[in-house]
Amino acid sequence: SKLGVDLYNYEAESVEVYKNNRFLKFSSTTTQNKKQKYANIDYDENKDVLIVNGSSFKGTTDKNFIVGTWWNHEIIKAKAQISAISGRIIHQNVNFLGEEKITINNKEYSTAHYNFSSSDKKLSKNKKLNTDIWYDIKSNLWIKASFDKTGYWEYRLKSYN
């Protein structure tokens, strides 16, 4: 907030469910600058597809598309991700940028650094994906994310048990 005025407000709550390492369902509600958004995604075992009911997309999609919550390392292999905020399908390019050492809370991690970008170049700038993600090389644990959207944002691992 600046001079008592909120410049950006974001609140989200989500649940992602897997059984035997297989995606079952995801649900989220998000308030972003007073706009309500949601995403509900279910795996339909009979049709072998994902059913998406979101504020930006409703329909079925490939079961190999992954919810864009970043913790699932398999996202680096996916042709598209599903927005955890709105259910929007985001076709992506993933580029490996190299290995890097990152220190967080006095602990050093050897990481693999990736850039995720929208493969659809016609999207408006505010809809384009352009996010850097770092995964621990040994465990594939999500260590860090950064992106530039209404300012530079960086998320880092706080602790890991």
Residue ranges and their predicted role:
Residues 26-70:
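Hydrophobic, well-structured mid-protein blocks that either form specific transmembrane helices
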